């Protein structure tokens, strides 16, 4: 089946997306932002049922953000906001998560923690987690497969191939 044949609603049940740019949801709590991930199942008005609420709570717990649930999103650090956006993607409950530079604004320890969390999500929840990054060191520590984009198009590489390439670059 081609993605082109899917409606927006169907796409939202297959792909969850975390972008580099984080929206300023000034008047929303962390819980409300994560609950937005349930929109493909609850509709525009977002009336959460018991199962939806359980998915939101699970996503908050998995990302370590449960204690922040009632806080306003605008009061959080960049790293905390990134965890909220990842929690929203988890709550969306899709088989594929796409993340654009999820460690872009994070310190080194937070980068490692975030990538380890994403790897655990892929493994424990049987999801395809696709991360775009320029941080080869972090990717080498946590990724199972690599796809590079260059003048010759897409290349699917094993970890050893990437290590050889980066070793040759110095």
Predicted regions and their residues:
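ABC ATPase NBD Q-loop/coupling interface
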Residues: 1-10
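Conserved ABC ATPase signature
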Residues: 72-76, 80
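H-loop/switch region of ABC-family ATPase nucleotide-binding domains
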Residues: 133-134
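H-loop (His-switch) and adjacent beta-strand-loop-beta switch element
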Residues: 146-160
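Helical segment within the ABC ATPase nucleotide-binding domain
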Residues: 112-124
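Catalytic Walker B motif of ABC-type/P-loop ATPase nucleotide-binding domains
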Residues: 97-100
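Conserved ABC ATPase "signature" region
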Residues: 35, 50-68
């Amino acid at each position: 089946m081609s993605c082109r044949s899917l409606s927006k609603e169907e796409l939202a049940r297959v792909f969850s997306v975390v972008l580099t740019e984080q929206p300023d949801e000034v008047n929303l709590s962390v819980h409300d932002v994560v609950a937005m991930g349930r929109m493909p199942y609850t509709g525009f008005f977002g009336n959460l049922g018991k199962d939806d609420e359980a998915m939101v709570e699970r996503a908050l717990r998995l990302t370590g953000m449960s204690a922040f649930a009632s806080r306003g999103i605008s009061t959080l650090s960049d790293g905390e906001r990134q965890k909220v956006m990842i929690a929203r993607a988890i709550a969306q409950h899709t088989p594929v998560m796409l993340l654009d530079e999820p460690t872009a604004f994070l310190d080194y320890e937070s980068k490692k923690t975030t990538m380890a969390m994403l790897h655990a999500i892929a493994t424990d929840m049987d999801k395809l987690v696709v991360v775009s990054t320029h941080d080869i060191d972090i990717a080498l520590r946590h990724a199972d497969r690599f796809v590079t984009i260059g003048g010759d198009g897409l290349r699917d590489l094993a970890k050893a191939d990437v290590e050889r390439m980066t070793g040759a670059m110095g």
